[in-house]
């Protein structure tokens, strides 16, 4: 279903309710440059890591899994038996995910606040365009919890919208991103109304800040494997 949610001002903060869930896949594809390519790229690195670590724990968590797109990408690339657990606090999103992945018997979804979940030991975690919605004071706590739950040689994927530390560059990057959204069919009003709804809800860090945060909780190897202007995909390994 086409995203027309912001044809007019919502007069409220953005939240992942039923209206958003109905159009979320279209919103993702038109709002995040190379969205599906990043999912495939992330799935590749997890699949390769599992191949090279034969004793890897057969469990992967996707936190803030929304409509389950990443698990579709993972199931295309992972050959061995693996348990996929998606956690999201939006039941409308999870209903969409369950519909899309009803034919996969290795997928389980839980409607919970992932900040309160006690994770089992896992071979991989993913936070794909999710950390930016976590309150800054809680991000380090969450990442430390993930790090402690990762098996040795496990990986964490972090996809994020980012900002530049240079004020002028940041303004230019945002302007280019808005041009991208216009080319995807969004009007000036839709872009402005969505920006208004996301203010103080989506709080981006710079690339350096995200990498420093990951390193501060224990990750020794953090790599930006993809970047387009103000979007990036990071792979962090626990060694």
Swiss-Prot record:
Superkingdom of the source species: Bacteria
GO biological process, one term: tRNA wobble uridine modification
EC numbers: 2.1.3.-
CDD domains per record: AdoMet_MTases
Chain positions recorded as S-adenosyl-L-methionine binding sites: 35, 64-66, 88-89, 195
Residue ranges crossing the lipid bilayer per the database entry: none
EC class (word): transferase
Keywords noted in UniProt: S-adenosyl-L-methionine, Transferase
MF (Gene Ontology): carboxyl- or carbamoyltransferase activity; S-adenosyl-L-methionine binding
Catalytic activity field: prephenate + S-adenosyl-L-methionine = carboxy-S-adenosyl-L-methionine + 3-phenylpyruvate + H2O
Family: Belongs to the class I-like SAM-binding methyltransferase superfamily. Cx-SAM synthase family.
Its job: Catalyzes the conversion of S-adenosyl-L-methionine (SAM) to carboxy-S-adenosyl-L-methionine (Cx-SAM).
Subunit annotation: Homodimer.
Protein name from the UniProt record: Carboxy-S-adenosyl-L-methionine synthase
Species for this entry: Helicobacter pylori (strain HPAG1)
């Amino acid at each position: 279903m086409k995203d027309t949610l912001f044809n007019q001002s919502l007069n409220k903060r953005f939240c992942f309710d039923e209206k958003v869930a109905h159009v979320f896949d279209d919103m993702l594809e038109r709002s995040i440059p190379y969205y599906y390519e990043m999912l495939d790229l992330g799935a590749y690195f997890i699949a390769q890591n599992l191949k090279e670590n034969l004793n890897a724990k057969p469990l992967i968590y996707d936190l803030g899994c929304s409509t389950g797109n990443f698990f579709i990408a993972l199931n295309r690339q992972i050959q061995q038996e693996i348990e996929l657990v998606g956690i999201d606090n939006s039941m409308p999103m999870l209903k969409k995910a369950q519909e899309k992945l009803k034919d996969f018997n290795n997928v389980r979804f839980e409607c919970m606040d992932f900040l309160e979940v006690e994770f089992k030991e896992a071979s991989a975690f993913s936070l794909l365009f999710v950390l930016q919605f976590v309150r800054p004071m809680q991000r380090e706590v969450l990442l430390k919890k993930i790090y402690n739950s990762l098996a040795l040689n496990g990986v964490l994927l972090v996809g994020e919208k980012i900002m530049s530390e240079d004020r002028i560059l940041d303004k230019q990057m945002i302007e280019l991103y808005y041009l991208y959204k216009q080319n995807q069919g969004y009007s000036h009003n839709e872009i402005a109304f969505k920006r208004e709804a996301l203010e103080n809800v989506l709080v981006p860090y710079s690339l350096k800040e995200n990498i420093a945060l990951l390193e501060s909780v224990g990750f020794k190897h953090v790599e930006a494997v993809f970047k387009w202007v103000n979007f990036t995909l990071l792979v962090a390994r626990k060694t």
